[in-house]
Amino acid sequence: MMQLSRGQRRWLAAIAVLLIGGFFIARHLMAPVPVNYQTVKVVHRDLQQNVLATGKLDAVRKVDVGAQVSGQLEKLYVEIGDHVKRGQLLAMIDPQQAQNQIKEVEATLQDLNAQRIQAKAELHLATVTLGRQQNLAKLQVVSRQDLDQAVTDLAVKNAKVGTIDAQINKAKASLDTAKINLDYTQISAPMDGDVVQITTLQGQTVIAAQQAPNILTLADMSTMLVQAQVSEADVINLKPGMKASFTVLGDPGKRFSGVLKDILPTPEKVNDAIFYSARFEVPNPDRLLRLQMTAQVSIQLANVDQAVVIPLAALGDELGSNRYQVTVLKEGKEEKREVTIGIRNNVDAQVISGLSVGEDVIVSRGGTGDA
């Protein structure tokens, strides 16, 4: 028998090791790779479909309080943040000009009353004179010219009284206006509210020639108005009466609720995107909400109590209108199902048919080496 050298034996041993290693590697590669399934159970729970938006808070009632007469703002009785009651004195404009106007009109009225007394006396005299002339005319002891003169004089005196009466009425109206202007120098609160802005400072002069200059702004903070900016894709699904709620950044755990009031028809363009203002009111008895706060708004489109629910991640290929393919893991094996879904939100979908509560639906799959 031929003896192998030491080198040949080493080569044969190396080849044997390679053959054995290759066999095990090939066996490993040909073996089926175990699949790890991530599944979620089909459950019963309440499901809502919402439109999400960002909005701003404003007061339902906000009034600019202005001056209706010109003059210097002599006194300002409030500061920003003060709560005022309806009728409370807020500011006063220098009343001297209005007071002088009243004095002038009263003097004019007094003079007109004196003129009227004189005119009435002259009218009485003219009436008596005409009567006397008419009696004399019957006796034919007065000329026709004198009689006509007496008639004319009576008419003139009567017209003079009428003119003075008209002037008196005009002066009375001017006096009423002057008194109203004096009242206007006292600026009072038209409603209960908080002073949220002061536009004119004490000592400044206001001119009310064309429009009432603004002195300050009052806001009724007991009820707030939420204006949510809703995209044009979502606004077609909204209608007044829908439930709406929101949270604010300062207290994200507290939710404020209301009912959608209206949707403004005029859009707002922001970076080439179109948004519409959906508005609703919320009570603010504790004054927690403030002007221009940012609101994270949710408007409820639909709600199903105790719906059959699966995550959106479980939905496979779309098979038709609201019909999808879903894979169920049953006894370790995949089973394809066709399901019909109802409402959905950004996370879950309602199952109308095709699945039962408790079944496991596959949301992802991967091999043993997958992270």
Swiss-Prot record:
Query: Could you tell me the Gene Ontology terms of the biological process aspect for this record?
Result: response to antibiotic; xenobiotic detoxification by transmembrane export across the plasma membrane
Cross-referenced Gene3D superfamilies: 2.40.30.170, 2.40.420.20, 2.40.50.100, 6.10.140.1990
Localization, per the record, is: Cell inner membrane
Location, primary (coarse class): membrane
Task: Cite the GO molecular-function annotations of the record.
Answer: efflux transmembrane transporter activity
Domain of life of the organism encoding this protein: Bacteria
Residue numbers on the Periplasmic membrane side: 32-371
Q: Which residues cross the membrane?
A: 11-31
Q: Look up and give the membrane topology term.
A: Single-pass membrane protein
Keywords of this protein's UniProt record, alphabetized?
Antibiotic resistance, Cell inner membrane, Cell membrane, Coiled coil, Membrane, Transmembrane, Transmembrane helix, Transport
Spell out which residues lie on the membrane's Cytoplasmic side: 1-10
Q: Which residues form a coiled coil?
A: 94-127
Q: Name one GO cellular component term.
A: plasma membrane
| Function of the molecule | Part of the tripartite efflux system MacAB-TolC. MacA stimulates the ATPase activity of MacB by promoting the closed ATP-bound state of MacB, increases the capacity of MacB to bind macrolides such as erythromycin, and provides a physical link between MacB and TolC. Confers resistance against macrolides.
Record's subunit section: Homohexamer. Part of the tripartite efflux system MacAB-TolC, which is composed of an inner membrane transporter, MacB, a periplasmic membrane fusion protein, MacA, and an outer membrane component, TolC. The complex forms a large protein conduit and can translocate molecules across both the inner and outer membranes. MacA interacts with MacB and TolC.
**Protein family per UniProt:** Belongs to the membrane fusion protein (MFP) (TC 8.A.1) family.
What protein name is recorded for this chain?
Macrolide export protein MacA
Please tell me the species this chain comes from: Yersinia pestis
Gene name, Swiss-Prot/TrEMBL: macA
